[in-house]
């Protein structure tokens, strides 16, 4: 009886591992179908009780694996741009731009996961698939991200994604009008406007 229990436990482990591997493979292969795109997005942030904290909107341009431009236009403008080596964050309101090396950027934020689509990033999560929904939970518990969900079609179109933090704050993003194809290279360059304070952390 004990041997049977051990065998069942081992079998369950193998099946779970296989399901996880299939989910990772499915998610990565779907995202790989679209190498570059533009989409508009809406954002809704709620706190642990479900009360609205912020709503916003903007535009997103991506060319995988390392080029992207995340432009929040409302309620306050902010820009996150990667030229493949440097990651720029610009806040026009405070007139400050921060530069960091992309290779040093954290891979445990939802947007970075989507933009990079690297196997090494996905390995850090337990992933479950339910149709077009993929639910990710970090294997390590020392980060701020509690759960990440992305809905991506078989054709690689991202419909929505959301992130739940440890304090249960939820940020949900709805993508609309995704247009696949070449993106103007200028979208992936950033030159700080004159007079802007630059915090260069590329040391």
From Swiss-Prot:
The keyword Disulfide bond does not apply. Residues 1-21 form the signal peptide. Gene3D superfamilies: Lipoprotein localisation LolA/LolB/LppX (2.50.20.10). GO terms for biological process: lipoprotein localization to outer membrane; lipoprotein transport. GO terms for cellular component: outer membrane-bounded periplasmic space. It is found in: Periplasm. It comes from the Bacteria. Residues 178-203 are annotated as: Disordered. Pfam families: LolA. Keywords: Chaperone, Periplasm, Protein transport, Signal, Transport. This is Outer-membrane lipoprotein carrier protein. Participates in the translocation of lipoproteins from the inner membrane to the outer membrane. Only forms a complex with a lipoprotein if the residue after the N-terminal Cys is not an aspartate (The Asp acts as a targeting signal to indicate that the lipoprotein should stay in the inner membrane). Monomer. It comes from Salmonella paratyphi A (strain ATCC 9150 / SARB42). Belongs to the LolA family.
